[in-house]
Amino acid sequence: NTWHNPANNSVKFISVLIFYLFAVVFRMDEAEKMPIFGRMVGKRALDVAVSVLTCVSVWLKPSFFQVFAPALAVYFVTDFIQTRRSFKRYIREAAVFVPPAFLILYQMKTLFFSGAPSGGVEIAFLDVWSHWSPHILLSILAVTAFPILVSVFCRSGPEMNRIMMRSWVFYAVALLELAFLAETGNRRYNINFGWGMCLAIGIITLSALMQFISYLHLDREDRGYRLTVFAGMMLLSMQFFLGIWYYWRVLTTPVQCF
């Protein structure tokens, strides 16, 4: 379940901080500054902070960066299509993640490509996921129904919409890793490619919640607005109570997923 791995738990707060801090820093100009704890901090200092935090997260457990790294490529491509920025800008942004990239490559070489019988990675579509979850589509719908509604009906400002889009990209990469990748050997069903999904669920739910709260503060009282708010409240409540039921099942049965 999502809480039995202490290393992944220790990465959760850091991964959320990196994700949203990078979303802000990526939009900043080189000379721009932002207030943090009463001090004005420049983009370069924030880039260093993102790099250091990402290294710490990889050192604790690579589950965040193994999803965030490929998601970054998607962010850069979509941003280039929309803005036509110079390639130098993307190279500078990517350079922030060179240290954690070297660290995670070293970890993966040690874990998966050391020649040990318990190491190795292969493509095995839904093999590991279906081993733990007999109802994969229902599991996906249970955690994405609220974010889907928010993304479709609760449009907010451009910055929140961008964050929501990036959250979906992060979730999609995590889902694909869990769906397609499997370890070889005796760790095959340890679902180690699923820890990124645990982080992605938290990030996309938090992004959807922030956008929904922003939508609640709109100066509207029309019927469509009230129906959207009601549906959002119902889906958010459903996700909350499904979570309670899930942990009750974890505590009372050997089932890890549903």
Question: What residue ranges belong to the model's regions?
Answer:
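Membrane-interface micro-motifs in multi-pass membrane enzymes
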Residues: 1-29, 135-137, 191-201
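Interfacial segments of alpha-helical transmembrane regions
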Residues: 49-52, 90-93, 160-167
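Alpha-helical transmembrane segments of multipass membrane proteins
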Residues: 55, 76-77, 179
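Transmembrane helical bundles and short interhelical boundary loops of multi-pass, membrane-embedded
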Residues: 97-105, 109-258
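Membrane-interface junctions at the ends of membrane-embedded or membrane-associated helices
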Residues: 24-44, 48, 77-89, 152-159, ...
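Membrane-interface alpha helices of multi-pass inner-membrane proteins
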Residues: 38, 46-62, 68, 73
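Perimembrane helix-loop-helix junctions
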Residues: 68-98
